[in-house]
Amino acid sequence: MPTGPVSPVSPVSPVSSVSSVGPATPAPGVQPHIHQPHHSSSALTPTPVSVPVLPPELDDVQAKPRHGETVARRAGRALRRVFASSAAAETEAVTRAAHAIQQPVTTGRQLAVSSIRGGAGKSTVAALLALTYAHYRADPVLAVEADPALGTLPHRLGVREVRWSGTDLAQIVDPSMLITDLTGYLLPFTGGGWLLPGSQGSIGARLDLDTYRIVMTSLRRHFATTVVDCETLPAEVARTALVTTQARVLVTPATVEGVRATKSVLEWMGGVHRGLLPTAVVVLNHTSPDGGIDVRKAAEHLGAGGAAVLPLPYDRHLAGGGAVRTELLGERTREAAARLAAEVMDRAVSRGPGGRQREGAREG
């Protein structure tokens, strides 16, 4: 992410099979120039009008963003680094994560993020993943909002206005389009990634299954990494995304109830296909500063079928809502986001745990 000891690692070059046209880095929330490709289908589709993500009257409601950690905690960590040797170990861990995040892909990797209920932090985790991949990878990164009714991905990514939605794009997308055609219908977010909103914030807006399939199939060859913020389960698009993507992330509150519900989802996934669990990652999201479960025991319970289980610590900045500003995240949160992105990419590339080692063994 933009802050953190990542200088020892340089981003890898994108592979030839994935479009190497790198994303621009315009200011957050700025609508790019709409480059209309000359296709007959686009001429039949009316151009949507840009609408704000949040109504103007709510501008003053959002409190000033806070740092993810208190001043005392940050000062304590600085002192420990002065008198201990943990800094080198932390740098090594981040470097390992960066290598995993940056590993080359031969075809686009699509990563689904879902949860069993609203309020688990699904859109927040999707935003963290999208920001992390956009920061570390040199090839194009896309975030797709597949939860148009209740998702908050555009807001979390700092987008101020939305225009084209997934439904709009599905009506005009054409196999002959280049990535430079497509980005005219997308929104840039901090770090160089692109966002495809699910709607213009309309109540009752839905993304039907056919539209989802058209969008995901059409965009895969242009984007090396796609993070999909799905509806909560058991919605049809969410179930389809969990089965058809290369890796899946289940976000659950770090509570006993959340663990129990997520265990049921994992059992369902294992019944659909035994190969789904080794490519699944469960995020235990701490939404309060007081931990309510034993993370180690919860990981043992949820990981029995092969899924990875990673904690996301409580962070004041994330808990406050609004756009995720990576410079305000607590250090533990940045490290957790990097570990999560690395684990998800490993499993998406290798279709299971221990990915790079297993792939290397096959090639040898």
Features from the language model and the residues they span:
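Phosphate-binding loop that captures ATP/GTP phosphates
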Residues: A134-G193
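Beta-strand-loop-alpha "switch" segments that mediate conformational coupling across diverse proteins
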Residues: H286-G330, A337
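NTP-binding/hydrolysis catalytic cores, primarily Walker-type P-loop NTPases
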Residues: G321-G364
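Extreme N-terminal, non-catalytic leader segments
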Residues: A27-A112
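Phosphate-binding/switch loop-helix module in NTP-utilizing enzymes
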Residues: L187-A238
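Compositionally biased, intrinsically disordered low-complexity segments enriched
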Residues: P2-P26
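Conserved catalytic-core segment of NTP-binding enzymes
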Residues: I214-V215, T225-A307
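Walker A (P-loop) phosphate-binding motif
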Residues: I101-H135
